[in-house]
C-alpha cells in the first residue's frame, strides 16, 4: 500500500512539474532585447524572463516567431506569454492583458538615414518613405511625422534597404538603434522622437489574470534587486546611471 501511495505521489509530482512549463513567444531580431548569438537566443528580455520564471517556479519554453505573429499566437493558445520589447499600447490592450512595465527608464525612437542623404531632422522626412517593422509602434510614429511607412518583417531588412537607398529612413527604438549604428556602415542618426507610449510589458491572454498578476508582482519585487541592475548594466549601459539614480530617489 505504501508503495502504491509513493508511486501516486511521484506521478502527481511529475504532472505538477509538467504543468509549470510556460511557452513564451518572442522575436529574436531586436537587439539588445532579444537576438540570436551562435544560434542561441540571448538578450535582456530572455535573461529577465528566465529570472522571473525561476522565481515563480516555471520552466520557460521559448518560441521564436515574427513580431506581428506574437499576439495572434497568444490568442490562439499556441503560447502562454509574450516578451519582445512590446509596449502595452491601448490598441494592444483591446486584445490582450499586460503585466506592469518591466523597463523602468525613459527611452525614445531614433530616426536613421543613409549617410549620403542631406536630411537633417525628422521634419525633412515628411512625405518620404520610412522603414519600420511590421506590427511595431514605429509605424504610428512614421504616420504622425507625415511620412509613408514601409513595413518589413524585421528591422534588419529595413536597414539593408536604407543602405541601398531604397527607402529614405528608418525609425527604431533608440536602445536598438545603437546596436545597428555600431555594426552597419552607411547609416547615421539625425533625430530622436520622444516616446510617450507605455513602456515594455509582458503580454498574456485576457483570461489569464492570475498569471499576469503573478508576473507583475514578481517584476515589482525584482526591479530593485541586484540581478535586475546587473541586466540593465549589461544590456543598456547608457541608461544604467539614470536607472540607479531613479531607484535611490524612491
Where are these regions (language model features)?
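Periplasmic-binding protein-like
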Residues: 28, 105-113, 178-220, 238-250
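Short helix-initiation/N-cap motifs at beta->coil->alpha
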Residues: 61-74, 134-135, 150-164, 196
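A ligand-binding cleft/hinge motif common to bilobed small-molecule-binding domains
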Residues: 72, 85-95, 141, 168-196
Amino acid at each position: 500500500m505504501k508503495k502504491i501511495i509513493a508511486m501516486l505521489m511521484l506521478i502527481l509530482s511529475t504532472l505538477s512539474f509538467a504543468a509549470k512549463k510556460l511557452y513564451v513567444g518572442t522575436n529574436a531580431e531586436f537587439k539588445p532585447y532579444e537576438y540570436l548569438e551562435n544560434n542561441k537566443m540571448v538578450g535582456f528580455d530572455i535573461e529577465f524572463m528566465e529570472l522571473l520564471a525561476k522565481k515563480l517556479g516555471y520552466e520557460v519554453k521559448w518560441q521564436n516567431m515574427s513580431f506581428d505573429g506574437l499576439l495572434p499566437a497568444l490568442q490562439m493558445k499556441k503560447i502562454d506569454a509574450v516578451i519582445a520589447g512590446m509596449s502595452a499600447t491601448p490598441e494592444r490592450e483591446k486584445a490582450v492583458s499586460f503585466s506592469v512595465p518591466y523597463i523602468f527608464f525613459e527611452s525614445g525612437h531614433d530616426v536613421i538615414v543613409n549617410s549620403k542623404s542631406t536630411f537633417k531632422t525628422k521634419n525633412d522626412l515628411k512625405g518620404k518613405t520610412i522603414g519600420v517593422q511590421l506590427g511595431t509602434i514605429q509605424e504610428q510614429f512614421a504616420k504622425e511625422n507625415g511620412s509613408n511607412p514601409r513595413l518589413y518583417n524585421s528591422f534588419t531588412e529595413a536597414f539593408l534597404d536604407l543602405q541601398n537607398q531604397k527607402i529614405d529612413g528608418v525609425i527604431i527604438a533608440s536602445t536598438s538603434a545603437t546596436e545597428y549604428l555600431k555594426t552597419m556602415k552607411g547609416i547615421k542618426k539625425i533625430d530622436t522622437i520622444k516616446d510617450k507610449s507605455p513602456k515594455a510589458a509582458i503580454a498574456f491572454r485576457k483570461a489569464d489574470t492570475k498569471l499576469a498578476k503573478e508576473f507583475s508582482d514578481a517584476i515589482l519585487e525584482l526591479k530593485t534587486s541586484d540581478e535586475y541592475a546587473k541586466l540593465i548594466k549589461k544590456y543598456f549601459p547608457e541608461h544604467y546611471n539614470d536607472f540607479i539614480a531613479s531607484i535611490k530617489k524612491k
